[in-house]
């Protein structure tokens, strides 16, 4: 068995190896190639089909195989690939060949004149060669002119993967050969079969009919003769088909390039030709690696140099080396401004070009170009920069030209990483070309390869040097601190580059080389080295990073930031330049991997006296250096003229064309290029102007330079898209349409294109739909017959019907739109119909009606009719129904079309009613009432919608007919009433008759009885009477329906005598006999019955054994009786129960409820006892310890602690029961560190210095250890146990000191957090529940007292505090491993099961393994409630969605309107809930930074209290909620709505998102905007601070521009929502910001403005623009209900804007529901808040791509940004310097006695060494020490603290009298382990090597952030 499985496994592995081998894969791909050859098979088949002999077949096959072999070789062999792939080569091949082919097949017509034998013979001899050539050339065409790209791509992919490439190519060729042979054999068989079959058929036909003989004989030769023609036609068709996919190289559409600088045009063209012709080898490589096989574009590098107008144009530093002295250089910069087009500098530069002055002069060089002829030819035949592939043109209006995306994202090249050669797949291509150029220049010197070991050692050595430099600088700073210099002076400053020395204006952040390094946008060249040194104050060790040295670093980043250069030429001193050559060339040698051994770097002239000796060498080296960077191949000429330094940077290949579509052309957006034709085929659309602003501008905000623009008319236009299928899809003219995937369209209107690959994913496709329900309905109808219909009250049916009507409508509209001259005809007909209707038809009808009324003696209704006629308004609308006005026709209406909408259409009635409607019937009638507007059709009919079917008009005569019907009905009623009376009378008469008849019958019966009696006495006497009886009986039988027998009631029946007997005696005797017999029978039966009854009676009374006494009952009777009684009881009871069931249930439920309520306290009794005990302990302790402090609100405190203890213990219980075990490594640092920050705070200062450094733990006094133990800092069992972890606890303590004043809010701000209880609870959230702790309540007490002590001036510190928290919070999230790295028990954290989010601010509770250490209550800091002030991480992580339960708890705890505690900057007191203007600019900024969820929320502005948006019932009061967990019932705060959250975990209560959107409620609506502006200002923009904040504002401005969010779906193209109001510190209101937003480019929404320079708009336009923007977001989805609503609003609103008195129409449209008041803005004062409230700005939960700033990522991942000096100056007056007596730490000042409301100084209590260095230097040191770890021991990783003396210098005040017997050596060896220098940090590596990670956005860092810090093992 084992052997079998072993064999089986081996066999499987063998099979897998065979399948995956190169040969098999090559065979497979080759076999596939057989089927992808396409039209090249045509010639091969032709040779066989036409039967031209075996020679031709063989030559065709040979040529075909040779061509295919060349193709395969070209895949592997680059020069052949290049030769075949060049467009010019193919063109040269194609043209003569096609000419020859044409000439060859038509030689009869050309050679008619001299049809000599010589020509014919020669041509015949050429036959075979021609066939060979055909078959050889066509496979070569196949990949380049007639591409089938999929297979080529597959082959390329596998070629890249496999190692043995040649083997793969060979095997694929063999596979192709096999497939080809099989294919040819199959073709032969088919041909043979066809021939045989054909002749067989024709013979059969000959026999059947003689008629067919003649044509059949001629058919076969005819076919054979025309075969050549058939093949030519087929070939032509396939070529046309394939050429449709790829435009012909000849018929290229030369596009107009963007306006080049006229002066530069010629020289640039020359260089273009040069490079293109001479750099073949480089192109070969690049074409292989960088572009696909069929890509005809030349190399990237030749493109880069080509267009001077590109954005990424690099600096040219042109040095005139001949005229001037050798050490003076001129620098020239090009500048292309894409942002500041309107600035005068740009305009001058743009227009004047390079003619500005002598400084900007181009040092031109003349050069004879051998290839002068090629440029026009090349551009004529093939323009390689045109869109010859199916590229979408991605517009980006910030950039001039679109980026070409033919360049692969990946570029493979070897580079050094960690000192070793590695292949990098995102290597910058420009760097590789740079290295190739250097290698070319290196041939001047000798070069030698270094071994990998040497390379690595060199790398290690350089890293050591760098690390030593940086650490030395760091140590110097620490020593300076030690000597007592001020902290701010020691901190490394971030050097800023100033523009102006006097005004101290710094460059913006983006352009500052010091702040951004390689990311800088501007390089400011300084005139000389002395000025340079003045400007650039850097540290001594910092000299590596001189300003211009950063040039080489421009190589490194791969992000596509566009560079801007200032045009300024300055001179450098050669000395300063030469000193830095070493640093400049170091990276070159590093990238090169080879060192230039003959270059003597030390020989560079560093001193002035050495200059002459080395001047020649210097010139040579400089020439080498600068010429190495030159791009010109003919370097000799350039060297003689000038030396050129080119800035090297990552280049992006761009198209040289800026394309526009027809819409942009219509808009005239590009005024300077308005004559240019559009090149993009966009969706068929028309521009419809809906609003023209003709009013005089009464705007005070417009600038003076805009007055000249006032004469232009401003328009607002909608784009009306045709609802036809869009087959253009923004294809560029001349691009390959057919190669576009996903181009299949099968719906009439399709918003998204669907690929046929995913047909199965689409619900119902056009041809694959098989609807079973439809089939069943169809069958049903057929089965049941035509008359019976299935009743379908199905909403789907209704929907289908509506959809069908809609489609018909669209079809009609498109038909009108597509027919030539249809629109003018239709428009004129509509206008005619409108005039006819209004002024001719309706007045005539009114006159006719009223005259008829007069004739019919009725009152005429002239007044009412004419009033209705006046009310009818004919509004001219655009083609898609946007109303304009009565008189204003839409622009170009004859061309674009028109609609005429009739408002209140006159419907002529025969009379007017003046009755008042009753109230109960009114609404019902209104429901059925139709809209009182319609559209006019061409035939004068009315229709509900444009192009809809005409609606049924109410008939004029219908009411008349109704009245007639009523009259007739009345007459009928009267007639029927008479009939009813008659009927009733007849009925009564009949009943009387019946009564009479009954009486008669009774009388007769009575007479009969008398007769019988008489007959008994004497029958003979009565014989005569009998006859009388009989006769009367016959009469009665006639009258009555049933015969009545006479003696029927008697016992003895007597039948009447029918036969008349003559012998009366016989009759008599027979009668008497019968009577006697009957009597006898009767008596006998009676007797029998009597006997039976008597027997029964005897039986009952004569049975003594059964029933002894008649009074007693037997057992059986008893049982039956009891059963009976039981059932009766049950019956009664059940009836009673049914009657009382409701009360019974109620009683049971109440009983259960009471039991629960009674039992819950019993369950939790012990808990409560514990808590009360703890509370008592706390208060006793607090009273003893803090007697001198003020008393606090005792009740509140009790309540708080009571709740907290319940919560704590409950969570202990739940944690113990359900522990989720997890290692700390799975937690984020944010979580752990946040928890640390919430731990119990040390209240005494005297511990701070004790814990400052590691060694002092030896000498701690016992009293201090006891204090530690009670404080819970160390949880050792005995106080003499070794104090191990103080190095880590150092950080704990620092954190505690840092976070203690997290809640130090000013009194005013604290008052805003309205409920007092809530304040207390927030304080209480910081408490911990340690079992050993006796001092638990003191912290809150301190805090509350402190709040009461604080002064109001602390408001000034808010901005400072905000910055501080932001700075420190970012970095303080970094360590949990270090804090717990020694204590194994602390490594595991047990979380409660309610932890849901693992995000930024973690609010769930956790306990560590040892509860003695610290158990922190979960909560959220006040930061979350104070909006922007303390929100730190939210700005950095827009991708995550958090849900904060704590916020909900506060909502639910007490019914307080959320506004009262979420108002951000409102000046409010607790008692007065007045709300004034909120800080709009901050919410704008917040929305700008983090794309918040926006909610479609309509809030009607009213003074009533608004309830928060109820997301799934989440904000309900807690009392209405079902109690799901009875254990937590007493603390409603705990009732987490967990189940709801599980259903939708991304939901966020909406009020929390729109934090400060609820201002202005009690403020009167019509206040002036200027008054609101003052309220809208942030605190920091006061006038006295304005100057100091300019710097920060500028930074912020730049940062925000890089991380812009947007509204709706246009993720890239919309601008900021106006955060500039805050940044620039201006006093503008929100409206100018909106204006700014609206004026930014609406590239996605196609709303264009004719006047773009206008700075401010009227309110109406702002509203209109916002509406339009919203409308356009949904325009593609025509069936959206939201879209319809918005569309209606737009139409009505645009109409209302034009009307002078819109009141009546407004009211009617609101009544009809056309216009929703929630959306329309009718108020005057519009602020951003109101726009959001009304739903005009809709923020949608769309994840948006944000362009990350490099610094922003660093800030996100690492950084405490440094303190600005200016801010320190502003706040210095509040800061007091403390005198700390280091020797007597017991006498330290108590914390609160000298506070003065300043929380900042605590951040400097324990100075973090990390803060000394700048983030950049910090990162550098950290990474270098990381590299150092690879060699040495992990413990020695921080050279700064290796020296014990340095540490000792920081202050030697240890108690050296105790515990000296400890192992001091061990302590010294352990070193100080700050968490600042961890082993490695993925984030740092990612930031350094982003081009290795290939990540340009920060989202992927969140993954690395989780597992960032490894555990350090301590030996």
From Swiss-Prot:
* Any one annotated GO CC term: chloroplast inner membrane
Give start-end positions of Acidic residues composition bias: 267-277, 304-315
Q: Where are the transmembrane segments?
A: 18-38, 64-84, 90-110, 126-146, 174-194, 230-250
How is this protein positioned relative to the membrane?
Multi-pass membrane protein
Polar residues: which segments have biased composition?
Answer: 1602-1631
- The entry's keywords: Chloroplast, Membrane, Plastid, Plastid inner membrane, Protein transport, Transmembrane, Transmembrane helix, Transport
The Gene Ontology biological process annotation of the record reads: protein transport
Q: Where is this region: Disordered?
A: 260-319, 1566-1631
InterPro entries in the record, alphabetically?
TIC214
The source's domain of life comes to Eukaryota
Where does this protein have compositionally biased stretches of type Basic and acidic residues? 279-288, 1587-1601
Subcellular localization(s) per the UniProt record: Plastid, Chloroplast inner membrane
Q: Into which family does the record put it?
A: Belongs to the TIC214 family.
Described purpose of this protein according to its UniProt entry: Involved in protein precursor import into chloroplasts. May be part of an intermediate translocation complex acting as a protein-conducting channel at the inner envelope.
Record text on subunit structure and interactions: Part of the Tic complex.
Name-wise, this protein is Protein TIC 214
**Which species is listed as the source?**
Platanus occidentalis
Q: Which gene encodes it?
A: TIC214
């Amino acid at each position: 068995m084992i052997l079998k499985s072993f064999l089986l496994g081996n066999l499987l592995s063998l099979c897998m190896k065979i399948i995956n081998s190169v040969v098999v894969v090559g065979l497979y791909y080759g076999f596939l190639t057989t089927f992808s050859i396409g039209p090249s098979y045509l010639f091969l088949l032709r040779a066989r089909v036409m039967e031209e002999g075996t020679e031709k077949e063989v030559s065709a096959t040979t040529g075909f195989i040779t061509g295919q072999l060349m193709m395969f070789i070209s895949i592997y062999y680059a020069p052949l690939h290049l030769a075949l792939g060049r467009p010019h080569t193919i063109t040269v091949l194609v043209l003569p060949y096609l000419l020859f082919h044409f000439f060859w097949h038509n030689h009869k017509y050309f050679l008619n004149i001299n049809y000599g034998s010589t020509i014919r013979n020669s041509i015949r001899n050429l036959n075979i060669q021609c066939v060979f050539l055909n078959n050889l050339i066509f496979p070569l065409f196949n990949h380049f002119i007639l591409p089938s790209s999929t297979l080529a791509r597959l082959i390329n992919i596998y070629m890249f993967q496999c190692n043995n490439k040649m083997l793969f190519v060979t095997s694929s060729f063999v596979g192709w050969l096999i497939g080809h042979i099989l294919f040819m054999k199959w073709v032969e068989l088919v041909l043979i079969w066809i021939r045989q079959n054909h002749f067989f058929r024709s013979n059969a036909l000959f026999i059947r009919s003689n008629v067919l003989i003649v044509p059949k004989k001629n058919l076969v030769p005819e076919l054979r003769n025309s075969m050549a023609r058939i093949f030519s036609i087929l070939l032509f068709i396939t070529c046309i088909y394939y050429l449709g996919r790829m435009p012909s190289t000849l018929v290229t559409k030369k596009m107009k390039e963007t306006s080049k600088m006229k002066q530069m045009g010629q020289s640039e063209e020359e260089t273009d030709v040069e490079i293109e012709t001479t750099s073949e080898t480089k192109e070969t490589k690049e074409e292989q690696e960088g572009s696909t096989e069929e890509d005809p574009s030349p190399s990237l590098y030749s493109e880069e140099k080509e267009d001077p107008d590109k954005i990424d144009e690099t600096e040219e530093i042109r040095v005139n080396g001949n005229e001037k002295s050798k050490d003076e250089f001129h620098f020239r910069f090009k500048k292309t401004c894409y942002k500041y087009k309107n600035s005068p500098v740009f305009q001058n530069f743009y227009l004047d070009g390079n003619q500005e002055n002598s400084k900007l002069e181009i040092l031109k060089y003349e050069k004879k170009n051998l290839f002068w002829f090629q440029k026009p030819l090349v551009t004529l035949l093939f323009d390689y920069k045109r869109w010859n592939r199916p590229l979408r043109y991605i517009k980006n209006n910030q950039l001039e030209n679109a980026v070409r995306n033919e360049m692969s994202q990946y570029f493979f090249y070897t580079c050094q990483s960690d000192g070793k050669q590695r292949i990098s797949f995102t290597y910058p291509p420009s760097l590789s070309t740079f290295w190739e150029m250097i290698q070319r220049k290196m041939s001047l010197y000798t070069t030698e390869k270094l071994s990998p070991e040497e390379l690595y050692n060199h790398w290690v050595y350089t890293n050591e040097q760098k690390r030593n430099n940086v650490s030395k600088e760091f140590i110097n700073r620490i020593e300076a601190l030690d000597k007592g210099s001020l902290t701010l002076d020691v901190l490394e400053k971030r050097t800023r580059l100033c523009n102006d020395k006097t005004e101290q204006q710094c460059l913006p952040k983006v352009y500052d080389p010091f702040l951004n390094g390689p990311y800088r946008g501007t390089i400011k060249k300084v005139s000389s080295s002395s000025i340079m040194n003045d400007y650039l104050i850097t540290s001594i060790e910092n000299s590596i990073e001189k300003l211009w040295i950063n040039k080489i670093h421009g190589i490194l980043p791969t992000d596509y930031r566009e560079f801007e250069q200032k045009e300024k030429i300055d001179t450098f001193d050669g000395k300063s330049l030469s000193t830095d050559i070493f640093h400049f060339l170091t990276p070159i040698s590093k990238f090169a991997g080879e060192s230039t051994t003959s270059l003597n770097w030390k020989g560079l002239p560093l001193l002035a006296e050495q200059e002459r000796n080395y001047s020649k060498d210097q010139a040579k080296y400089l020439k080498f250096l600068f010429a190495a960077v030159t791009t010109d191949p003919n370097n000799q000429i350039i060297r003689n003229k000038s030396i050129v330094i080119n800035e090297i940077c990552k280049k992006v290949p761009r198209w040289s064309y800026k394309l526009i579509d027809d819409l942009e052309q219509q808009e005239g957006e590009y005024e300077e290029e308005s004559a240019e034709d559009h090149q993009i085929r966009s969706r068929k659309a028309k521009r419809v102007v809906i609003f023209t602003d003709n009013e005089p501008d009464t705007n005070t905000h417009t600038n003076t330079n805009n007055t000249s623009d006032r004469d232009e008319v401003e328009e607002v236009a909608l784009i009306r898209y045709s609802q036809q299928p869009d087959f253009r899809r923004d294809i560029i003219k001349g691009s390959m349409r057919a190669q576009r995937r996903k181009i299949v369209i099968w719906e009439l209107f399709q918003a998204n294109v669907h690929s046929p690959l995913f047909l199965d994913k689409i619900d119902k496709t056009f041809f694959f739909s098989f609807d079973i329900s439809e089939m069943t309905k169809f069958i049903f109808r057929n089965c049941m017959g035509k008359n019976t219909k299935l009743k379908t009250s199905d909403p789907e049916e209704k929907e289908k019907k509506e959809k069908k009507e809609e489609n018909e409508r669209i079809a009609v509209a498109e038909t009108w739109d597509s027919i030539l001259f249809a629109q003018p005809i239709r428009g004129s007909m509509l206008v005619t119909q409108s005039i006819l209707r209004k002024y001719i038809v309706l007045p005539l009808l009114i006159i006719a009606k009223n005259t008829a009324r007069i004739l019919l003696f009725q009152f005429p209704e002239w007044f009412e009719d004419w009033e209705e006629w006046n009310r009818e308004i004919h509004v001219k609308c655009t083609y898609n129904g946007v109303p304009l006005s009565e008189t204003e026709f839409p622009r170009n209406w004859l061309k674009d079309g028109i609609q005429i909408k009739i408002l209140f259409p006159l419907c002529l009635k025969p009379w007017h009613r003046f009755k008042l409607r009753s109230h109960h019937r009114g609404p019902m009638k209104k429901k059925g009432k139709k809209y009182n507007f319609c559209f006019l059709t061409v035939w004068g009919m009315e229709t509900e919608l444009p192009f809809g079917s005409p609606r049924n008009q109410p008939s004029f005569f219908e009411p008349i007919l109704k009245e007639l019907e009523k009259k007739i009905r009345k007459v009928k009623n009267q007639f029927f009433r008479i009939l009813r009376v008659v009927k009733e009378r007849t009925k009564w008469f009949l009943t009387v008759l019946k009564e009479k008849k009954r009486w008669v019958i009774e009388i007769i019966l009575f007479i009969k009885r008398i007769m019988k009696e008489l007959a008994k006495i004497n029958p003979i006497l009565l014989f005569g009477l009998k006859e009388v009886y009989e006769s009367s009986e016959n009469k009665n039988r006639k009258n009555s329906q049933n015969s009545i027998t006479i003696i029927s009631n008697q016992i003895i029946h007597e039948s009447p005598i029918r036969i008349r007997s003559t012998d009366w005696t016989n009759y008599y005797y027979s009668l008497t006999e019968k009577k006697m017999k009957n009597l006898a029978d009767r008596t006998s039966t009676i007797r029998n019955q009597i006997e039976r009854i008597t027997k029964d009676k005897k039986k009952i009374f004569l049975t003594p054994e059964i029933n002894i006494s008649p009074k007693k009952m037997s057992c059986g009777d008893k049982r039956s009786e009891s059963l009976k009684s039981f059932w009766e009881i049950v019956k009664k009871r059940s009836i009673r129960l049914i009657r009382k069931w409701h009360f019974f249930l109620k009683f049971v439920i109440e009983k259960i409820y009471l039991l629960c309520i009674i039992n819950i306290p019993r369950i939790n009794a012990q808990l409560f006892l514990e808590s009360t005990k703890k509370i008592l302990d706390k208060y006793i302790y607090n009273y003893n310890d803090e007697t001198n402090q003020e008393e606090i609100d005792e009740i509140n405190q009790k309540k708080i602690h009571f709740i907290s203890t319940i919560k704590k213990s409950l969570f202990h219980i739940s944690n113990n029961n359900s522990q989720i075990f997890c290692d700390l490594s799975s937690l984020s640092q944010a979580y752990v560190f946040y928890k640390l920050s919430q731990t119990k705070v040390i209240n005494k200062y005297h511990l701070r210095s004790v814990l400052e450094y590691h060694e002092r733990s030896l000498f701690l006094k016992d009293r201090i250890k006891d204090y530690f133990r009670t404080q819970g800092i160390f949880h050792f069992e005995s106080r003499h146990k070794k104090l191990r972890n103080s190095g880590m606890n150092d950080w704990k303590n620092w954190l505690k000191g840092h976070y203690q004043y997290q809640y130090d809010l000013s009194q005013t701000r604290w008052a805003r957090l309205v409920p007092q209880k809530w304040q207390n609870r927030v304080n209480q959230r910081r408490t911990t529940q340690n079992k050993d702790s006796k001092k638990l309540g003191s912290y809150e007490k301190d805090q509350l007292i402190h709040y009461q002590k604080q002064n109001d001036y602390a408001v000034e510190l808010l901005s400072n505090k905000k910055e501080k928290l932001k700075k420190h919070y970012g970095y303080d999230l970094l360590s949990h491993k270090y804090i717990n790295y020694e204590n194994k028990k602390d490594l595991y954290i047990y979380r409660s099961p309610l932890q849901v989010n693992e995000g930024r601010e973690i609010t769930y509770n956790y306990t560590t393994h040892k509860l003695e250490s610290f158990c922190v209550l979960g909560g959220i800091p006040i930061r979350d409630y104070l909006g922007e002030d303390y929100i730190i991480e939210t700005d950095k992580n827009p991708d995550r969605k958090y849900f904060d339960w704590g916020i909900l708890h506060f909502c639910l705890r007490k019914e307080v309107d959320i506004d009262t505690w979420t108002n951000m900057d409102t000046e409010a007191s607790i008692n007065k809930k007045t709300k004034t203007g909120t800080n709009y600019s901050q919410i704008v900024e917040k929305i700008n930074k983090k794309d918040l969820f926006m909610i479609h929320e309509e809030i009607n502005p009213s003074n009533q209290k608004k309830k928060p948006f109820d997301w799934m019932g989440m904000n309900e009061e807690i009392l209405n909620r079902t109690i799901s967990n009875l254990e937590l019932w007493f603390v409603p705060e705990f009732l987490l709505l967990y189940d709801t959250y599980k259903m939708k975990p991304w939901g966020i209560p909406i009020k929390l998102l729109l934090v400060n959107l609820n201002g202005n409620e009690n403020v009167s609506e019509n206040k002036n905007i200027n008054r609101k502006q003052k309220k809208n200002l942030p605190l920091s923009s006061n006038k006295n601070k304005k100057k100091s904040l300019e710097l920060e504002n500028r930074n912020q401005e730049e940062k925000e521009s890089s991380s812009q969010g947007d509204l709706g779906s246009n993720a890239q193209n919309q601008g900021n929502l106006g955060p500039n109001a805050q940044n620039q510190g201006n006093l503008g209101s929100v409206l100018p910001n909106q204006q700014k937003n609206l004026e930014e480019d609406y590239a996605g929404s196609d709303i264009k403005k004719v006047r773009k320079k206008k700075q401010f708009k009227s309110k109406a336009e702002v509203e209109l623009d916002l509406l339009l923007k919203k409308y356009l977001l949904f325009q593609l989805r025509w069936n959206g209900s939201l879209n319809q609503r918005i569309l209606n609003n737009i139409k009505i609103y645009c109409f209302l804007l034009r009307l002078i008195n819109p009141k009546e129409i407004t009211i009617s449209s609101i009544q009809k529901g056309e216009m929703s008041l929630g959306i329309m803005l009718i108020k005057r004062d519009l602020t951003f808040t109101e726009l959001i409230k009304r739903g005009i700005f809709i923020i949608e939960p769309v994840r948006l791509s944000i362009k990350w700033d490099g610094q922003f990522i660093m800030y996100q991942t690492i950084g405490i940004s440094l303190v600005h000096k200016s801010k320190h100056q502003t706040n210095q007056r509040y800061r007091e310097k403390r005198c700390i007596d280091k020797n007597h730490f017991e006498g330290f000042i108590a914390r609160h006695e000298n506070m003065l409301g300043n929380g900042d100084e605590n951040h400097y209590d324990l100075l973090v060494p990390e803060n000394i260095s700048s983030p950049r230097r910090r990162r550098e040191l950290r990474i270098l020490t990381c590299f150092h770890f690879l060699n040495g021991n992990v413990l020695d990783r921080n050279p700064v603290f290796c020296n014990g003396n340095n540490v000792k210098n920081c202050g030697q005040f240890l108690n050296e009298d105790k515990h000296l017997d400890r192992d001091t050596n061990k302590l010294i060896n352990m070193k100080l382990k700050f968490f600042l220098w961890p082993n490695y940090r993925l984030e740092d590596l990612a930031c350094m090597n982003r081009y290795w990670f290939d990540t340009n956005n920060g989202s992927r860092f969140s993954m690395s952030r989780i597992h960032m810090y490894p555990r350090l093992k301590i030996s």
